[in-house]
Amino acid sequence: MNILFLTKSFGIGGVEVVTMTLAKTFAKHGHQVGIFSFYRADDILEKQLPKDIPLYIAHGYKNSRENISMLRQLLVDKKIEVVINQWGLPFLPIRVINQARNGLKVKVISVYHNQVDTNGKLKACDQAIERCQNPLLRSVLEVKKFLVKSITSYSMRYVYKHSDVYEVLSPSFIELFKKFTGIKNPTKLVAQTNPITIDGSVQSEKITNVDKKEKEIIYVGRLDFVQKRVYRVIDTWNYLEERFPDWRLTIVGDGEDRENLENHVSCLGLKRVSFEGFQNPLNYYKRASMLLLTSDFEGFGLVIIEGMSFGVVPFVYGSYPAVYDIIDDNINGFILPMTEKGYDAAQMARKMADVMKCPERWLQLSKNAISKSNLFSLENVYSQWKNNLDKMNVGG
């Protein structure tokens, strides 16, 4: 079948990496695939695209005649049968798509790549309300949050209504979707997980030998405050560094919060913390023993399953429902439950210390993590996608 992925931008980012991975997998199975992006963020991913997967760059992120005309021409010339809208919340992409496909037999799947009932804007409102001591200003912030939530809910309903299928990343998000949007019987709603995005050829080289693993804890991801809360990773390590002198913490990623985090490390007097910046995480997955993720919310947590596929035992803050689809607590990783008191660095450190001092237990957890990660392999996820497309009577 002929498939066109649509993204807001095409540069380094989780959604974009998943898009490229799925595009390459569909192409491998004989489908004709292209990617339409409203603008080019950088050329890092573009350089990794195979020649048989064209990237079409529009005229900016806008609902314009130019963009509609360009997209319609692609739909006609390339005989596109399905558009996979990877930006399944904003109004603009679905409006452009539906104007472009008017009168054509083109199906649309919209995908929401985050936790259904929250996002960065809503969390920023929550955090501002928590910090506010002024009752009047607090009331204003509450109104702002209500408006942001209402607009987000309406936008999600709109995209759902104007798509043939709407996908969320976890079965646990289905009930959240119903509650958040007010759609009681969402017959077009499908739960579809993201795949491990590391090449199968690399996957076959996974290191599972405990002798080749290092005593290293890693964080992989963006360095921001609103969502990722990486300072919690550092606070947790603060309980561990002196007790485990042969272990180290490595932070892989970059972002606007990096300077604050580096200052936090200095203030705590920590010695074995390394900031690596943006890097391909492959070598870190190969050598690390544990992964620590302390986000306030996530869509799915791709770094968790990627790490698990290399035997990296995950320790994750249970702030979002989908993590319970990935980790079986105390079997292939650990989840620190979310409570009203918030993240407890000392309790997480105790969970990690119990494993750090017992290599035999770590080894069993590591093997179990690899086994669980197979559920999210590219081939398994592709089969789920193909099944969903077949149900829509798209292609053959």
Regions from the language model: what does each represent?
Residues 54, 259-278:
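Nucleotide-activated donor-binding/catalytic signature segment of Leloir-type glycosyltransferases, i.e.
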Residues 85-92, 112-115:
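Short His-centered aromatic/hydrophobic patch
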Residues 313-317, 322, 327:
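Short hydrophobic beta-strand element within catalytic cores of glycosyltransferases
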